[in-house]
Swiss-Prot record:
Pfam families: Toxin_cobra-type. It comes from Laticauda laticaudata. SUPFAM superfamilies: Snake toxin-like. It is found in: Secreted. This is Short neurotoxin OKI-01/OKI-19. One of its GO terms (cellular component) is extracellular region.
Length: 83
């Protein structure tokens, strides 16, 4: 009985993922979609866009950085929300 209880506790911890971290897209403009787990405590994702001689450039990642004027920044707080 104790073994069954211990097994249920372990399964619950694994399923609940108590060490939960945010997941954000991190692929550049023209690359296939990829995402990564953010560092613990980082609860937002960003999508940063600007134009240069190559066209519109997009950068994605974890956090919500400060940007220079002329750069469009969108920050969000859900899974893979920065595409």
């Amino acid at each position: 009985m104790k073994t069954l209880l211990l097994t249920l506790v372990v399964v619950t911890i694994v399923c609940l993922d108590l060490g939960y971290t945010r997941r954000c897209f991190n692929h550049p403009s023209s690359q296939p979609q990829t995402n990564k787990s953010c560092p613990p405590g980082e609860n937002s994702c960003y999508n940063k866009q600007w134009r240069d001689h190559r066209g519109t450039i997009t950068e994605r990642g974890c956090g919500c950085p400060t940007v220079k004027p002329g750069i469009k920044l969108t920050c969000c707080q859900s899974e893979d929300c920065n595409n």
